[in-house]
Amino acid sequence: MKDINKRIASLPEEKRKVLARLIARDTGARESVAAADEIRPPEHTLADEYDIVIMGGGLAGLTCSIHLRRALPQARVLVVNSTKYPAPEAAHKVGESSVEIGAHYYDTVLGFKGHLEDRQLRKMGLRFFLPYRDNRDLAKRVELGPFENHILPIPSYQIDRGRFENMLAVAAGKEGVGFVDECKVSGLTLSQNGEPHVVELTRAGEQRQVKTRWVVDASGRATAIIRRKLDLTVESEHKTNAAWLRIKLPIDVEKFSDDPEFRGRMLTGFRQYSTTHLMDRGYWTWLIRLASGSTSVGIVADPRLHPLETFNNVDRFNDWLDQHEPHVGDLIRANRHLIQDFIALKRYAHHTKQVYSTNRWALIGDAALFTDPLYSPGSDFIAMGNTLVAELITQELAGADLTDRVEFYNWLYRDFLYDTAIRIFQDQYPLMGNAQVFVAKALWDIAWYWATIGPIFFHERIADLEFMKSIKPILIHFQDLQRKMQDFFRAWDEATIDEVYCDAYVDLTKIPFLYPLVHLEMDAGYNADQLREKLADNVSLLEAVGAEMYRGAYGALPTEPMTSSGLTVSEHLERAAKRADVRGQLHRLWFVPEREAAMAEAV
């Protein structure tokens, strides 16, 4: 205990404050959200006509409405939501975990940092536990996550969706947004000649029509009003399934092991505030603590290895956990009476032929597309999509022609952002059983995010048409790197599929080229020219990272690896040699297989 107190005392003041908030929240010192927050938006009387109607009042729709009113204070904005507000806490929705872009959008762009710090949980990064034998010995599993940087300088949050959306609905009303709940969109007529669109609404058995210049579809994956009406849905080749529940129980993964070395890697109690991923071949299981005291527990799996039918109800879900993640299975089984809800979702990934139209409609959130929950990208897509929509509407209402902008934004959101993201996940679930390959892949995936779209969004350039067009060749280069590296990881896994790794941990915040040079510079305040130069430098850095990863796997692959840019092997290794810092720092990612370690010990 004295050692822990010393370590807490040595933390910077800001980190101690965050720790104090977490402790206060866990001990019940915080007053209830019902007593502290307004949770019912003001009543709104429907008008005959609006500038913008947003169909859907969930996370995407509410944040978009606030964003639009800030950008266009005179605009008449209506949000139509089919369900009743206030929503229950621990609302049964995906999107409880945010990462840098989404968190920055919520806390800084929209200005809700106070709510996120006081009413939600500050997240301690992403944390991964790779498989070892029957997965009962957590301390033996390879662990990837932050250890010493307990309070990361660029914040992210674990978000209780019900609590957050209740606050957003009230905030939208205060911004002048019209909000109606328990109201269904029963029809939509899209104008083709510049006249207003017509939205048909049904509320309490009464029907009403409203006209609008713009219509934004935030109605979600299942309803997807415009995507279904215009037959825009594209079936994704990424066919994974998910099931999850909320349980009124704070789950601390650290309590799954009493190993002193495992416990001593970081301050006691901090692991539970990470988004925790328990992984094995073909699946991962999430644990997400929520500020309301609940924990979200989910299974995401490739049906070729783990069919949805094996975990698609509570009993099967628990049985599946007993077999694959026994610590979680035991805990759920002992507390079945605390389960709050359960849902299973088949083939959650989906795509669209079009996101934005010169005909004054747009898709946002899950009504547009969704990739995969692994790295918590849902709020990122909301942030980027809302920003693009706000710029489109602002430009159009000012009289601008949207043809060029709509064409580029569709390419950016659909063909660049979605395509590069889906490749991270598609056909990659089997390699989650390979600790060596997945740790390298996770570093690559996170580095790619920090090096590309992260700094673009943080520097408020995502909707800057001139700037984004100027860096399109860089983006295409990033996209090509992504495609070929994901192919490489798959080949590497197939070549080393039988290896077992254990007794290792990696802290990505301790890799100098990655953390300070990429992550911390996402928000460096660059002007357009400096940011363009930084992105070009980041391409070069990622090439070197990819080259060194090829070098590390070279002996395992059945054929000579080619570099992402198509260089010969000799040119490839020469490129890697120019970044000796990358080589030295990535060396800590290479693990010794258990069989080799045992042989060395025997000798």
Regions inferred by a protein language model and the residue ranges of each:
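Flexible, low-complexity inter-domain linkers and amphipathic docking helices that mediate domain-domain
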Residues: 1-37
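Beta1/beta-strand and adjacent pyrophosphate-binding region of the FAD-binding site
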Residues: 43-60, 78
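Conserved FAD-binding subdomain of flavin-dependent enzymes
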Residues: 67, 88, 92, 97-120, ...
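Glycine-rich FAD pyrophosphate-binding loop
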Residues: 69-94
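Predominantly flavin-linked oxidoreductase catalytic cores and closely associated redox partners
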Residues: 87, 171-328, 386
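A conserved beta-strand/loop capping segment in the N-terminal third of enzymes
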Residues: 108-158
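FAD/FMN-dependent oxidoreductases across multiple families
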Residues: 281-283, 289-293, 305-427, 431
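C-terminal helical "tail/cap" subdomain of flavin- and related membrane-associated enzymes
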Residues: 393-603
